[in-house]
Amino acid sequence: MSKLVAPHGGKGLVCCLLEGKALEDEKKKAAGLKQIEISSRAKGDLIMMGIGGFSPLNGFMNKADWKSVCEKMTLTDGTFWPVPVTLDVSAAEAKSIKAGEEVALVRKGEVMATMKVEEIYEMTEADKKMECELVFKGEGPDSEKFWEVAPEDHPGVKMVLAQKEYNIAGPVKVLSQGEFPEKFPGVYMTPAQLRAKMDERGWQKVAALQLRNPMHRSHEYLAKIGVEVCDGVVIHSLVGSLKPGDIPAEVRVKCIDTLVDKYFVKDFVIQAGYPLDMRYAGPREALLHATFRQNYGINNLLVGRDHAGVGDFYGMFEAQEIFRKMPTPADSGKRLLCEPLNIDWTFYCKKCDGMASMRTCPHGKEDRVILSGTKLRKMLSEGADVPDHFGRDEVLAILREYYSGLTEKVEVKMQRAASGSTM
């Protein structure tokens, strides 16, 4: 019998992905349905509903659930849920759909799911603004200052404001996991697959390290703290879409493979990937990270400095603080059971000659080097020398190769532009 934490919501893994004859029959039916083109984010959400990663959700939220999640961080039935999971459509599409109708949800020519539309509701500019304030603003600037910069500088806010005029809600039948199983074999895992792997190892107390950047020395330090205090650590990478300028998942996965192979005891670490896009929701997104990690069988989330941060919008430890403020339903099945493992500031200390934290290092600021993915990307993109304490040599070599390839592509484009060639 598994010793792992139960899935969120008290209903086991709620998986909307069809298989076998049911899948073939639904695909045939989908061919005759009205098609709705969906975003990359919605595609990731659908796959998570398909594989049970978003348990207990079985479809996109209606307006009552959307409002309750924004205001209270719970669904209307009292189950904890930190961010809206909605599907937007244009006014013309909304007008063409009737409640009770089934539609096919399509992403770039691939039918991802069918959906029974139970509700169609308008999202006014005031509704979108409310979602941004409650979900994305955090505890930082006041509303006036937030709105001075967020529409241009906050990627999560920009996405919400750019959404179409209506949302549609209802249960889904998922027909595909997209490109992820083939693109990331052995890394992309469903909750059931990861749970089986951890059960084989007899794990019970498991920590996850959330990653959207290449794994630098601070990440390695956090992961090894998790190894020390838990049965094992899952290095869990986002393999969906990020913002322009971020490093592709294929490169990040290769970096982690190399790091795990050379610097970890393999019995105590698993590399895995999940199919979501970043929402850039700051502290609320940290809660989402914990929520779906519970579905993967993980009961601790490593939360360090500026977890899921966006620029300067959030306090350095606001993502840790929100776990103390979230609602705790009386029913344990509806409560979030994945707890944070809070880690203080981490850095490379020149005097300690190694990674340290505010709790372990007595030295001053002049001896401390804060490591971040943003700094690392900047140095690599500019071709600057990267100090050894930022990353392992083997990882930096992979990243340099990637950025070298980008430089070559830019130079080729410039040469073609100068010569007038479009080939």
UniProtKB/Swiss-Prot annotation:
It catalyses: sulfate + ATP + H(+) = adenosine 5'-phosphosulfate + diphosphate. InterPro entries: ATP-Sase_PUA-like_dom, PUA-like_sf, Rossmann-like_a/b/a_fold, SO4_adenylyltransferase_pro, Sulfurylase_cat_dom, Sulphate_adenylyltransferase. It is an enzyme of class 2 (transferase). The keyword Nucleotidyltransferase applies. GO terms for molecular function: ATP binding; sulfate adenylyltransferase (ATP) activity. Pfam families: ATP-sulfurylase, PUA_2. The keyword RNA-binding does not apply. Pathway: Sulfur metabolism; hydrogen sulfide biosynthesis; sulfite from sulfate: step 1/3. Its EC number is 2.7.7.4. GO terms for biological process: hydrogen sulfide biosynthetic process; sulfate assimilation. Belongs to the sulfate adenylyltransferase family. PANTHER family: PTHR43509, SULFATE ADENYLYLTRANSFERASE (PTHR43509:SF1). This is Sulfate adenylyltransferase. It comes from Desulfovibrio desulfuricans (strain ATCC 27774 / DSM 6949 / MB).
